[in-house]
Structure formats: C-alpha cells, structure tokens
C-alpha cells in the first residue's frame, strides 16, 4: 500500500528517488503528457459550460484520479516512490527544506523568474519546459511575490468546518467546501498557493513545476480530512445536473471512472498522519 508522507519528513534517499523518477518521466516524454492534459481542462472548464477538472464539484475527484495516474507512472520507474504532500500551512517560507537544492530548488531570479538551482533548473539540462505559453523553456518561480502569505492553519480549519460539499450553481460562484478549498470563494486556499509559487504554477501548465504534485497531494489530503469530519455529507450533485459531473457520471478524459469510485482514497493509498 502506498503511503503518502509529509514532504518535510522525507529521508534524503526518498527525496533522491522521487527526483530521479520525475526526471525519468520527463526524459521519456510521459511527464509532458500530464501537463498537456491539465492545460486542456483548464482551458475547457468554464462557469457556464461543461466543466470537469476545475470550477466544479468534480475538481477534487478529477485531481485525485489525475494524481493516481501520475503516481503510478512514477512507480513504474521506481516502485518505492509515493507522492509526498506539501503542508503549506506549516512549511510556508522560501527557506523551507522543500525549496532546497537537493529537492525542488528555490525561487527564480528577479530578472526573469528563472530557477537557478536544484535538479529542475534549466542549467541542469534535464528540465526543458516543452508545453508552454511562450518561448521561455526554463522553469520559473517567484515565491511569495504575487501574494505574500500562504494559507494558515486557521483558514484551513474554517473551510474544513463547512458541512456541505458543494451547491448550485456548481461553479466558481458556489458556496460550500469544494469551492472554498479550490479557492474561488472566501479565504482562497488552493488557488492562492498556485499564485504564491508563481511562474508556470500560476498558469494552466502548472504541472510543469514538480511542486504541483505535492500541492495537490495536500489538497487531496484536505478532502480526506473533510470527509472524516463530515461522514454524513457526501459528494453532490447526485444526478441530472447539466454541464457538471454527477456522482455516477464518468469523468473525462478517462471515461471509465466516476466520482463515486474515488470517494475512498484508502483503496489506493493512505497518508502518514490524520
């Protein structure tokens, strides 16, 4: 059984193995396929049209499946690897070990945002950004520049306390847990972290930055935490809702999995802590 650990607790060997697996997926082309898929859904998901990966109830199960697919790809390279999660309420500084040269590397230089250290820096020669919005082929970050503070634990707790998963109009204007976690309403959790990191993380091509996977692993954990606190509150909508994914509808691009199939993460992995 895969155990997803807090990235702050990874051993040096676990970090090394994860980095090596990421670099291999990049080398063999599979990594960029995930970037392309994510960007297609960012572009296609709209408040008034069909929406699957974002701005909709299926934001959480869609990303759960997306991360599962990516984690399995990593494990085909190295079976010992699991996706760690980044608890940004605790590791909220640009000096956190997450950003060290032996792991993800740090922020970008002020001139152009280019990441200059770590295994994913352009100078390593191993991380050319191929799926991109412009001619810049290097990983970019501007940690804490566009928004100064990452979400706090108190802000997370305020969202975890919300008793209803989602509600009409089932988009970025909705009240409820999903939309507050996604970040279109209220304290802005998930979206704010993308903006705090900056660079490619602030675009539809956000998986170009490996921190995407650690960020979304934590968002996924928060969904699991919410489920445990609200066992009587399930995924909604259940049926007959235009433009969104109901409980038993299949989700694109896989077309073989429903939100109902992804409500229990323990069939696939557990977390190191509640």
Model-based region annotation:
Residues 1-274:
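C-terminal accessory segments of proteins
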